[in-house]
Amino acid sequence: VSETVNRLNGGRRTSRAAVAIGAGLVLQLLTIAAVLLATGAIEEHLRGVYAQYRPDQAERAGGIVVTYLLVVGVLGAAGWLLTAWAHRRRTRWTRVLAWTFLVLGTLLAVTNLAITEYGSRLVPLWLGVAGLVPSLAGLAAVTLLHRER
């Protein structure tokens, strides 16, 4: 992968941390795409959650949850872009920034898995797990950033 990135980068050597950051951005964008493609499934899931208790709230909840997931996804992508920019400029605070986004992103992803209402998850399990995947790239990125010192 690094050799391909080097060729695309005009022959300049690309660090492994930069590759991990780029992979994290791609994974984040795929997570956003999953939310967009699964809007109907998310709304159907929430109809099941609210069916016995508040069927009138199911449609509204679907829109709220989808909007929330999209906003979180876009903010995550912005975090990846900011981290890539800081790394490319070789700023002193790149590692702190990467750690901050890793912790915040992972906490949000775990929260998405844990949020329940009426005993059921608000975010479908498969989508909650998919939201954790960019954190794996983030863990790789912060590890590689510390090795670059």
What does each model-identified segment do?
Residues 2-149:
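Topology signature of small-to-medium multi-pass alpha-helical membrane proteins
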